[in-house]
Amino acid sequence: MAKIIVIKGTSGTGKGTRVVQFIEWLRTKLKPTELSYTVGDKTRPFGLKFEELKLIFVGQYTVSNKSGLASWTSMDAIHAATGSGDIARDLVKGWLAQGYTLVCEGEPLMLSDKWRPEWMFKNYPIDSLALLYFAYPDRYQYDARIRGRSGKEAGDSGWSRNESYSKEFEKSKAEMLALGWNVAVDDYSGQDVLYHQTATNTQEFKTGNDSELAMLPFDAPLWVVGNAIYHQLGTVCRANNLMSKDFYGYCETNPMTREVGGQDPLAHRVPEKPQKASKTKNKAVAKEEPKTSSVSLLGLMRKA
């Protein structure tokens, strides 16, 4: 029963941070396998696979060329490396066809009808999805966030897409209804909607065929993405002794938030680049060290 969790929204809303928060918690219990893909003569990282959960996080750890901080990047890296949205979607489809649940995050190329419910249900072998959007309420908060994240002033291109994501969220909700999904729960004036299929049990997240669409604020708790993934996986997590209450506690004690000149909790996940050999009259051979290898979301935000 393949599923897909898609996280997209305005730049700097902490999408990747919330994804990697769940990854790092899983790594305290399970050991992932690193996946790669090859296009032409280039082999690149594809993601991390947790076989016990049949779960793949598309992406890789990286270092920001703006802030110098370690982070998680997902579809943006594949789009940039291949220069093709079609190749990226084919890679995703290949793993979904094998029954894996995939977590894909990114922007701006995911602001597309091909990352909305209608296209995904018609082109991917999936039973359900969670589609989470993140946005800012105003430009002031966007500018402040970008300065704190990169140490530089925000540009206009990222902000211009903020309104576009809000409009796309409404389109996605309309597509779910057109596809025959019924609204099970509608919270916060349509900002968090749970859907079920007519032929399934109407209890939220009990059948494994429930989907969710949510528009979340940029300052939502660190656990909101992990919570959505957890519920899509259902009993698989509990069968592996992965309890949601433990994840909430991990978010409190081990936040993956980072700051220029401050915390950089993922630095150890990114291998240091070998230093270039100094130039001398006699050229030395530089050796590179080997590399180490149902409850709604917005409702849960009030749990504290």
UniProtKB/Swiss-Prot annotation:
Superkingdom assignment: Viruses
SUPFAM superfamilies per UniProt: P-loop containing nucleoside triphosphate hydrolases
Region: Disordered, residue numbers: 260-304
A Pfam family of this chain: HMUD2
Gene Ontology biological-process annotations: symbiont-mediated evasion of host restriction-modification system; symbiont-mediated suppression of host innate immune response
Presence of the UniProt keyword Phosphoprotein in the record: no
InterPro entries: HMUD2, P-loop_NTPase
Biased composition (Basic and acidic residues): 266-275
Reactions mediated catalytically: 5-hydroxymethyl-dUMP in DNA + ATP = 5-phosphomethyl-dUMP in DNA + ADP + H(+)
Swiss-Prot/TrEMBL keywords: Host-virus interaction, Inhibition of host innate immune response by virus, Restriction-modification system evasion by virus, Viral immunoevasion
Family according to the record: Belongs to the thymidylate kinase family. 5-hmdU DNA kinase subfamily.
Protein function: Phosphorylates 5-hydroxymethyluracil (5hmdU) into 5-phosphomethyl-2'-deoxyuridine (5- PmdU) on DNA as a step in the pathway leading to thymidine hypermodifications in the viral genome. The phosphate is added internally to the DNA polymer. As a final result of the pathway of hypermodification, 5-aminoethoxy-2'-deoxymethyluridine (5-NeOmdU) substitutes for about 40% of the thymidines in the viral DNA. These modifications probably prevent degradation of viral genome by the host restriction-modification antiviral defense system.
Protein name: 5-hmdU DNA kinase 2
Species whose genome carries this gene: Salmonella phage ViI
